[in-house]
Amino acid sequence: PTAMGYLAAETERVIIASGILPIYTRTPSLLAMTAAGLDYLSDGRAMLGLGASGPQVIEGFHGLPYTAPVARTREVIDICRQVWRREKVQYMGDHYQIPLPQDRGTGLGKPLKLINHPVRSDIPIAIASLGPASVAATAELADAWLPAFYTAEAADAVWGDSLRKGNGKRAGDRSPLDIYAGGSVAIGEGMEPLRDRARPGAALYIGGMGARSKNFYNDIFSKSGYEAEAKIIQDLYLAGDKKAAEEAIPDDYLAKSSLIGPEGFVKERLYALRESGVTSLNVSFAGADAAERAAQCENLRNLVDSL
């Protein structure tokens, strides 16, 4: 929140998004208040990013049980939107009860509403989700979807059924789901070696971001056409050979998951992303300094405008 408040004060037009806030670490009302405060500071430019994280982080770092991530996410979204409408919050879900039932506390809780007036009564919510049930819920309820290890070629096979299921239940008055993907950007001849910068992060998530038996990122990578590689990377990483795990990341994946290469190649990747359903780009720019990164941003914008 501190960093987002700073950015809100220093900018005028860009959307200020929270990244991915784990739903277990804050109450739904606090998540709603955080987004409402940011929306006020930014004059209506906030986006609330939410995710369930995973059991190793929630239980190992936060000391909380990792239970019912999809159902909890659904309830959090419902409560946040109730708060933003400045209704007296009353919610009796399976995981959140507001006010707290009298037999579980002092009995003094009563329905309350947000004192401040948000700029908007429906702040956009982006959900980071990967599994079938969570992606379906995202397509049904959220405003935007933040996938990981997205490649245009595998997207429909991995997530298509879930997206169609969720979109079939989506409220008619909510705008179509905004799908974010893209990766690192470096447009020009001879840029291909910059793809290797993604190896450490990819190896960490595929190999070590979760237990061997429950690593969501490894599952997605495997389903994306890299089943053998996913197992090798995980084995190497968990054995402590991180360098070998990084080297085992397929060059083919690094090319498909980024926008790095000659202008023609990047334009082809943009077409592929659009055809797979991507509606917004989630990217980072390569460059030695701010000027180089700004130039890459301008290059990408020109290519997008030319599609």
Predicted segments, located by residue:
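Active-site-adjacent structural elements that line small-molecule/cofactor binding pockets in enzymes
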Residues: 1-307
